[in-house]
């Protein structure tokens, strides 16, 4: 059987880190939003005597021209798509021959959950083929692959807490014209979190984040987040912009350029270094993409996606 899946990127309209956990991970509070920038997956699978997974990879033209991410991509067993497929089949008790064709358009290691989106797409596709799990079971499986994979599986607009796997759908999706842009640098998530730990004293409570004032932890975060989105169409804050990383200088330059091109709000997404700008109209956003591309900077037009 052959299944086509769109693997949509996400942005963080709000992102705060609330605690460092005993297991070394961090608890977050984030408003995550699915956007139309996507990778494409075509997955074929049929039962076989033993499991074999093959991944073929194509880099999208814009990504190839501006972002130069191809060297960072693996088509081997360490690719998260292969990990997702193997996990699904092992838990389902199925041996299968799986073929995956991936067209990559989401920048890598950019805070856009490109790999997580691909993993979620693989899980959805395999479940359409084999139907081994309920939605709830598939969500539990996705959490084993990474903190952003559960949201990418569910999609839409949501308040995410815990490591990101605790998801509350906000039942409201702002209609936003978005430009996503990224320079040449990349930021590993581990490096970004280590920088935050240094600034916020391992989140022991002695140094407070501005995010707590914007979206306080009072048991009503979901209602507050929904109200903020409905009133302004945005709730922009990202604690990683306060991490002191040297890479933030390039981030700030792109944010400034987006503002010069008419963005009402700009923010780094995830642990960076991708940046998004919110524009009043699609025409303004298209113009910004054109000007950034002319300057040799990766930029892509996106819209919010409703689920």
Where is each model-derived feature located?
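ATP-binding N-lobe of GHMP and related small-molecule kinases
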Residues: 1-110, 128-133, 173, 182-183
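Residue-level signal for inorganic ion chemistry
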Residues: 13, 41-43, 81, 115, ...
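Short beta-strands and strand-loop turn motifs
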Residues: 14, 103, 234-237, 268-271
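DPxDG-like acidic metal-binding loop motif
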Residues: 81, 110-138, 151
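Phosphate-handling active-site elements
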Residues: 89-101, 125-145, 282-294
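Glycine/threonine-rich beta-strand-loop-alpha-helix active-site module
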Residues: 131-171
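Conserved, helical-rich catalytic subdomain that frames metal- and/or nucleotide-binding sites
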Residues: 154, 159-265, 280-293, 297-307
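Conserved glycine-rich beta-strand-loop-beta hairpin in the small C-terminal domain of fold type I
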Residues: 273-275
